[in-house]
Amino acid sequence: MNSPALLRCLLGSKKRAAVVVAFWVLIAGLLAGVAPALESVEDNASANLPPAASDSMKARDLVRAQLPGQDATPAIIVVRGKGTDAAKSATQSVAAITSALSGTSRPDHVVSVVSTVTAPDAAAELVSQDRGAQLVIVPMEGSPSDESFQNAVDEVRALASDRAGPADVAVTGPAGIATDTVKVFSGGDKVLLLATVVLVLIILLAIYRSPLMALVPLLAVGVAMRVAETLGAILADAGVITVSSQTASIMTVLLFGVGTDYALIITARYRETLLDEPDRARAMQAAVRRTAESVLASASTIVLAMFALLVAVSPALHGFGPYLALGVAVMALVAFTFIPALVLLLGRSVFWPGGVDKAAERSRGAGIWHRIAALVARAPVKVASAVIALLVVLSAGLLGYQESFNTLSGFRAATESEHGQHLIREEFGPGEIAPSTVVVHSQDNLRSSPAPADIATALTDADHVSRVADPRMGKDGKTVFYDVILDLDPYSSKALDAIGPLKQATQSAAQAAGVQDATVLIGGETAQNADIRSALDRDTTLIVLLVLAIVTVVLVLLLRSLLAPLYLVATLLLSFLATLGATTFFTVTVLGDDGIGNRVTAYIFVFLVALGVDYNIFIMSRFKQELRTQPPAKAITAALTRTGGVISSAGLILAATFAVLMTQPIRELFQFGFAMACGILLDTFLIRPLLVPAIVRLLGNRALWPARPGTPQTPSTPTSEPPSADAPAARAAETGTSRLLRAFTWIAIIEACTWAGLLAGMYLKYIPETTELGVRIFGTLHGAAFIVYVSLTVLVAIRLKWRLGRTTIFALLAAVPPFMTIAFEIWARRTGRLPQPTADPSPTPAL
């Protein structure tokens, strides 16, 4: 984009601009004609599963292989009797429902019916303790994602409701949950798209005050979205990437937010350039050339952050990034070609009714942002202290942080499957909602052995086990399956923590029963959620480190500085903690959610860091440009004044588009939308205009260390004066101060690096077969760096005659990493997020 020849080729005239616009429209149309519908290739099942190599998935595969017919998806009908004789009412209703589902007119996909009528021996498992409620199990064949399967579930529900009479009846279970999930999502994309378009259009009209200019970003986003969706559908159909309904929803708001941001940046610079260059084609070329570096850095950061998700082993994260990275890459190409070309093609009418002159004058950036810049220049210490204090207060919401793995509680709309699970919880106990499947595989045949019964007896005495169903023998005679009902909510953290001890208890029971070298696996929803939690913990740690590394490298390359990326990344981390704290307080403490969705935290971090750094990139890039003509203090003031309006408008639009996700009836999307809106507003109106300029103002010439601002290029050249007699002494004092400041900077970098190593070591010590060596090494180095840092802070403060406030801020910054490390350790132990070492005496043999 820095090539003038390329810009002249694309934007040299109206005819060339028309060719560019026609090219994109043609590409969008051609791809739409050959690509399948995105909905037809969406995969919503794998996103909620643990890694394929996890124990729970191995257990599921064994159930399908060893128990023929058990791979059907069950619908569970809950019947609760009414009246004085609830037991009789429930029995009559179950008989009528069983008859309707067992006849020749039963719905398609229904394999069989298991109830007290067809299986009276199973009454102990199908009838509640007070006999007022009963269960009817209806295995259904086919894929829950097929429309015919969902229609069959609806028919089962209609028949059950019709034949139940006065009894309370609900259809739940995996089949009911899958059908309700599809219904909750159905139509959501259209509502989301419409709400986003209307909201963005209103904001753009308020910003541009021109209807045609407001339509330009929307048309660009529409073209980019069409191209990205069709390319994504083609790649998903070929099995190259995975696309889910949630990913598609986030793609919509992401492209609207990012696309309008890029459009605002480019068109604002275009209006500003028109003040000096009346030729619109040359002005647009100059605008694109001057914004290319920052916009490309922004897009590259987002794309690389999305690709960083590929290191994840959990399907929910692994398949999330490529599709979004594709969309942002397409949006960046459209922003640099389609948007400038369309603006040129529309000519002077694009600024109607205000005209070019008023549009150009609005780009001067006077008004409130000049006053804010002046405030930061007058009192940088007070401004920085106030912002940091507010962010710390918001971070306190993390005290109520907890995660939720319950899919049904994540629906913000009432569903029949959730009502059914509520009935099961009340009448049969919480564990009956989702039994765990314990699998014991032996090298010997167990058909005639008493071991399976002995193991079942032993399991009834295990912690948190309510009951154990009769063992089922696999067709190979070597594999035994036990349905184990826990006395805990199967979606709670305590239930997830109980899976490990249950496996150990089964291993001990198998050895006591004489089954040597047995392979023990735990399946079911609770075990799957435990494996998902372990995978997410591992993935989140890797993704955090990788995304921070990516952002740091991009900032180093863009700003040619080693120090600036450190304090910019620190502001992003502080913003993330404040955002997550505010989200936890609002959704969990105030709204009463079970917890933060198990994947939401990782999503928030990746998106907030990748998008939040954009505004830092925009203002710091302008700061670098202003340094060519002004000293640092005036340069940061000018950068904030010139970019304040456009970046704030961009942030407002981006926050608004993500806030639209709060209209979706899914907890994860609601929480993610709230968090992103909150975090982007913090970045836009606190961190970017106040905290970052205050830090730059405090650092002065060292803000871009080791780069030093050159002599500003001013029209007048000051006359030289003869050196004074004190010049050698002044130079010596300056050299000593520079060395001290250089040492101060390097020890800050060392402290940050040793802190990162300490966090990694703390995580690794929780993994089996690892030691605490990393914690000891990096802990010692970090402690030494901390002491040296505080000492140098005092020396620098004395040497430069700092005030107490500035000295206190820098000293407190050194205390933040140790405090966060301790908080991390306490939080990890409280929540149990980090994997705990297993206590198995020997490794589990492979099947």
From Swiss-Prot:
Pfam families: DUF3817 (PF12823), MMPL (PF03176). The keyword Transmembrane applies. It is found in: Cell membrane. It is a multi-pass membrane protein. GO terms for cellular component: plasma membrane. Its main location: membrane. Keywords: Cell membrane, Membrane, Transmembrane, Transmembrane helix. Residues 708-729 are annotated as: Disordered. The chain crosses the membrane at residues 18-38, 187-207, 215-235, 248-268, 302-322, 326-346, 381-401, 539-559, 562-582, 600-620, 643-663, 672-692, 744-764, 778-798, 808-828. It comes from the Bacteria. Belongs to the resistance-nodulation-cell division (RND) (TC 2.A.6) family. MmpL subfamily. This is Putative membrane protein SCO5905. It comes from Streptomyces coelicolor (strain ATCC BAA-471 / A3(2) / M145). The lineage of its organism: Bacteria, Bacillati, Actinomycetota, Actinomycetes, Kitasatosporales.
